[in-house]
């Protein structure tokens, strides 16, 4: 089955159109990294509102992204052991990135001027 997903976000056309309409961002482009990141924030927030998934739960957010909000509600992912395995890998990666960020957060929060003296 051919998908309409492309660009950084790999968003399908109907979902991308919903994003553009709901955010009044009619010029958003799936091949623009900034727009794709804004889309992800929108999608994560909607997933939280629609299915009650924490914005910090990478595993369940991923399953919603892959299966769609209705597919997740129906439990479609429960019939796909491979997908659950991938979602666990996504979650482990998110936890690793969060740990890495904490180790350099202080350095990143310094202004450019103070970085000159580090």
Language-model segments: residues:
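Catalytic and substrate-binding regions of cell-wall glycan-acting enzymes that process beta-1,4-linked
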Residues: 56-108
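Charged, glycine/proline-rich intrinsically disordered loops and linkers
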Residues: 1-2
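Low-complexity, Gly/Ser/Thr/Pro-rich intrinsically disordered linker/tail segments
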Residues: 109-118
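Alpha-helical segment that forms one wall of the substrate-binding/catalytic cleft
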Residues: 6-60, 64-73
């Amino acid at each position: 089955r051919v998908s309409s997903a492309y660009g950084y976000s790999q968003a399908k056309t109907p979902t991308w159109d919903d994003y553009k309409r709901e955010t009044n961002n009619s010029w958003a482009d799936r091949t623009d990294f900034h727009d794709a990141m804004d889309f992800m924030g929108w999608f994560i927030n909607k997933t939280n509102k629609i299915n009650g998934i924490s914005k910090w739960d990478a595993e369940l957010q991923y399953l919603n992204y892959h299966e769609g909000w209705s597919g997740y509600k129906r439990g479609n992912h429960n019939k796909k052991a491979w997908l659950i395995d991938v979602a666990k890998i996504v979650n482990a990666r998110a936890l690793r990135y969060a740990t890495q960020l904490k180790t350099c957060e202080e350095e990143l929060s310094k202004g450019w001027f103070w970085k000159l003296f580090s």
